[in-house]
Amino acid sequence: MREKNYQYRPCLHGKKQRLKNRVLVTKVSATSDKQSMKRKNNIYEKIYSMENLILADAKARKGKADQYGIKVFDRDKEGNLLKLQQMLINKTYKTSPYSTFLIYEPKEREVFRLPYFPDRIAHHAIMNNLEKIFTDMFTTDTYSCIKHKGIHGAARSVKVALKDVEGTTYCLKLDIKKFYPNIDHAVLKSLLRRKFKDQDLLWLLDEIIDSTNGVPIGNYLSQFFANFYLTYFDHWIKEEKRVKHYFRYADDIVVFSDSKLYLHQLRSDIADYLIQHLKLTVKDNYQVFPVVARGVDFVGYVFFHTHTLLRKKIKQSFARMLANRRNDASINSYYGWAKHCNSKHLLKKLLHDKTV
């Protein structure tokens, strides 16, 4: 399926011209982003260079040196890297079988895991060369799994937006139904071919994409595939719909406006775009509400115009973590979360009373 997309031409003059500019006139809106105009080639040989594979191994093992798979790999590190290089050169690389497990925070999800060798090294070898290409395409309004952005980057941007009190009277909050499992392989491959023309690279990406249904949560590559899958949608929101206050973290979307009617119409437009172009559906539990009434629950915080609180479930998990004296890394993570909101009294209570 070839995704249709459009470019919004800026208004020049007069009512007639404004009406004309509302017509969908040119294919591929994301090509207005200069980073998306040029298709990339000659990448594959950089992926299998020994220098890149050594770097990929170093990145993939960071903080995980005690894992059994890494210890096995290290028994013949040089030989194993040469094997991986030959798999890539000869195009005999095939994704290994996945193991799966469940996580329950922040919600129950099935997580997929691949062996350290050859898969996790191969994924890092790919992203050493593709990460900047992908991130250069992303709009400034997406935050998940992007260096120097993430949860706290999203929180900072929402706080800045809410300083425009009149322009953020109402909030549209929605997310996509089973986003990762429902990513369509044919659509994802089509989008990748709009960006890359290196046929060997596309073979490798196709092999990984087709290794399971949807895009598996837990793969290093998956977070980039997911953001890339929605990046043309992000550009449509910003460049054609001209939405000022828009924020996306993975499949969680928040939009602010001074008009409830506008947000309801935008939700309908978003649902139409996602189903027509990306074969995705918006969950039925979307919300349009006044910010002052209950705040905006997003990326672990509840945002108001005047202050920011920690989400109730995060607060409860933090309290349990402290009460049970679980690992320090997790406690530090929750503490870092709490520091970025109005939590002085909460922290004082938790750190002294160990209860909420």
Regions found by a protein language model. Name each.
Residues D74-P97:
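Amphipathic alpha-helical blocks
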Residues M1-L82:
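Non-catalytic, polymerase-adjacent accessory regions of viral genome-replication enzymes
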